[in-house]
Amino acid sequence: MADKIHIQPFEKLNRFFEECLSDAQLYRSSNYSFLKVFQHALSYDQIGAHSRVLKNYMAWPVWAHAAFLRLKAIVRKSSPQLALHEVVFIDPGRLVSDESGGWHSIYMQKAVSLFPRNQISHIGKKKDSRIAFNATLDSIDRNYSAPDKLELDLLREIHEIVVKTKTTTHWSALQKAHILSALHVFFDDFRFYYKLFKNQPVKSVVFISHYHNEGLIAALQTLGIRSVEIQHGLISANDLYYVYSSVFSAGIKNAFFPDAICVYGNYWKIILKKGVEFTDSQIVVSGDYLQHPEITVSRTEKQKSILICAQKNMHDEYVEYAHSLKPWIEAHPDWNWIIKLHPLEKNKQAYEELKPFNFEIIDHQRSLDSLLRECSIQISVYSTTFFDALGFDVTNFSIQQFGMYRDYAAQMVEEGVAFPLLVSEDPIEKALNLQVKTPPLERHDVYSQLDMNAMRKAILSS
């Protein structure tokens, strides 16, 4: 039976975490903090994702669990190890095409180009015929050799947490099941990456998203390999895994955060510094490594176009909002209405019903930059596309009424990157009557000039 998912605002989840995870002893072992692992588990419980409760052996005594892993190693032989170079890039596989039709990694292309090919290994998460990765994670089996001392040391640390979890009255039975499942996933991920990087010449690994990558970071820390995160989207004070409040000060140390994080501009560094998870020196302003064209927008390029930038897995909300625009479409027949789908949208068919209502649905046919050059107004809820629009002479509107996203939407307005918009408002009339048409933020604060030396130093620093 499928889960009945009840998505909750991040603001509410953050309050819940601050209340139930304020005591770091609940998730801290002798040498590690499993704060983020507990966050994953409790998030799934809160939203009703109970299929995330997995069969596992985390409650077994360490000796029994170790014996079981040794037996599995005999039955399931591990495949030969990949040969890796000094710097490894783990690419999520989001690609962008150039004018000649060639495909490039939107996140990793420029970072990879910093090093000679014989010094790097470019690994994709999944095989993609459009780009030549050195290897892909989905092609590597999860069969392991018998656990060595370092693996067993971590298993003992996890077992400390398991004992605490099972004996405390702080958690419900279902929450305990989620926590043990999350620890199981963490340990399996750790073993996967430990196998991948053990006895290799690797010095640094670059990836996006430190959250849900705790097993990777644990393996790198165990092996003395530098871990570097590069920013892949917006960072907000309302995030679940960034800008941790002082409530978590006792639980942040050794909580599987990367050694450094590269951000697009000083704007993002200022936000991150409000949290307790990174020190100033760990946050490196490396500039805009994404592929944006030079911005030379003139008034004559602008058209009477409204760009609605949809967000991943929010098709229900955006389709409903588009239908509510019917009065304004009829009131402004000389305006064009464009909906740009998120590149990772899984339910693109949901938008097809809007075509008869004068909406142009765009997937990969045109780049975001080309659309921003032409449109006068952009509408979304919370999105990096608001920041992408800086310098393009676009009026950004953030819809404020989608309940579970209202905290993020409010943040967009508070940060000065978008103006508030109610579902009932005519966006064209509102834009025409604004005293100030574009956000006060400067593009260079958000996307500073690419600093190749800063990024290279962040990746290689010991």
Tell where the protein language model's regions lie, with residue ranges.
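Catalytic-core helical/loop segments in enzymes performing group transfer/polymerization on anionic/lipid-linked
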Residues: 1-462
